[in-house]
């Protein structure tokens, strides 16, 4: 009786260990092939921004992953796209509480926009809610949400309407319309200063304006006066408006105080970097951050720090090591039960059965060795091929965007 009870306890313990192991593997499945001792390399950066604590938020992997990087340059967490969260994030900001807000765009039929929304994540990257949703017109390929600015406990987002630009504050639950003429057809991106209630916008024909109540908006920058200039994303912070210039491959800096309005200067990177990469986006609140297809650039005045990868935080390293250990235990347990079963079959059945089992065992062993040897290479090739195709797609989209801007410039 005591021997039987001992077996039952062993069975219960093994069952609990199996359930715990399966839970750990399922919870960490997205980190299964991440080496905890190597830096996490960006695959295709779409956007980056900073917060007041020095942390950086990066949209990576073709808009499907959000990364939070600590002030000392370590990866804290990663949130992945899903039907229960976001599908394709195009902008990211963090409020004073550490909550993260995403501009989520849902695409259908290749390039047509089905809907847009503002998705709220917790400071740990967990989905909380969708705080705003905008249905797109059928067949539309242009975004209606054209900017986001973080607040202490929420976010302000700008949305194109027939009447102009609708500025909504989720913290206060308020909204206001700025009557910009032909906003839906003209405006590419907006920035907003909450302190002065000022709206800035860049148009498809390469001009940057500040909204005025007079109906004649103030022209701050005209790309027609600068050969090759194509201003793209804009962002405002502390009296200065910044714009990513995808034509000249630098950052336009426009002081917006009374004394310096209309003057501009530029933040530029080394020529070798200009030849390889373009800073498509810039975000000023918190920390001035720009991003290229491959990297993130943190600015400090004229100086900058560029990085393509980040080491994992200590917590993530421990979690990954635990995940690998659990996987090793599961593999060992499966092999143990397989060997035990094989021994039982060998003892119980005939020589023919023994021979068959031996052959099957050899085949399984060879297959396991083959898969274990070639799978990492196959995974690497698959990732590289997917990455190359995505880069080609992004490059094609950017070229199309540039052509559209140029054509719009001619039209206006």
What are these model-predicted stretches?
Residues 38-64:
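Beta-strand-rich domains and repeat architectures in extracellular enzymes and scaffolds
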Residues 55-58, 99-101, 155-157, 198-201, ...:
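Conserved beta-propeller blade signature
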Residues 354-376:
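Internal/C-terminal transmembrane anchor helices
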């Amino acid at each position: 009786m005591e021997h039987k009870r001992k077996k039952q306890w062993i069975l219960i313990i093994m069952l609990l260990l199996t359930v715990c192991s399966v839970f750990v593997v399922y919870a960490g499945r997205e980190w299964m092939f991440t080496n905890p001792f190597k830096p996490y390399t960006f695959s295709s950066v779409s956007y980056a921004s900073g917060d007041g604590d020095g942390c950086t938020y990066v949209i990576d992997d073709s808009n499907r992953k959000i990364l939070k990087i600590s002030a000392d340059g370590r990866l804290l967490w990663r949130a992945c796209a899903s039907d229960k969260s976001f599908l394709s994030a195009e902008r990211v900001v963090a409020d004073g509480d550490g909550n993260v807000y995403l501009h989520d765009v849902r695409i259908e039929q290749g390039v047509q926009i089905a809907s847009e929304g503002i998705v709220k994540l917790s400071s740990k990257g967990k989905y909380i809610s969708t705080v705003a949703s905008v249905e797109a017109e059928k067949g539309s390929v242009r975004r209606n949400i054209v900017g986001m600015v973080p607040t202490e406990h929420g976010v302000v987002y700008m949305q194109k309407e027939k009447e102009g630009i609708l500025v909504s504050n989720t913290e206060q639950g308020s909204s206001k319309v700025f009557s910009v003429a032909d906003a839906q057809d003209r405006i590419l991106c907006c920035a907003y200063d909450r302190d002065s209630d000022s709206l800035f916008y860049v148009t498809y024909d390469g001009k940057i304006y500040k909204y005025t109540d007079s109906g004649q908006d103030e022209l701050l920058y005209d790309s027609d006066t600068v050969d090759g200039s194509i201003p793209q994303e804009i962002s405002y912070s502390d009296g200065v408006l910044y714009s990513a210039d995808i034509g000249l491959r630098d950052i336009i800096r426009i002081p917006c105080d009374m004394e310096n309005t209309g003057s501009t200067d530029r933040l530029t990177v080394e020529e070798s970097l200009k030849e390889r990469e373009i800073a498509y986006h810039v975000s000023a609140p918190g920390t001035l951050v720009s991003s290229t297809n491959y990297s993130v650039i943190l600015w400090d005045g004229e100086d900058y720090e560029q990085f393509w990868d980040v080491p994992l935080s200590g917590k993530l390293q421990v979690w990954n090591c635990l995940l690998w250990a659990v996987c090793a235990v599961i593999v060992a347990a499966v092999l143990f039960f397989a060997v035990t079963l094989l021994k039982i079959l060998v003892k119980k059945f005939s020589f023919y059965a023994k021979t068959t089992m031996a052959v099957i065992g050899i085949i399984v062993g060879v297959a396991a060795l083959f898969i274990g040897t070639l799978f990492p290479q196959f995974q690497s090739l698959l990732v590289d091929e997917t990455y190359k195709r995505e880069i080609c797609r992004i490059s094609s989209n950017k070229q199309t965007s540039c052509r559209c801007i140029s054509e719009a410039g001619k039209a206006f």
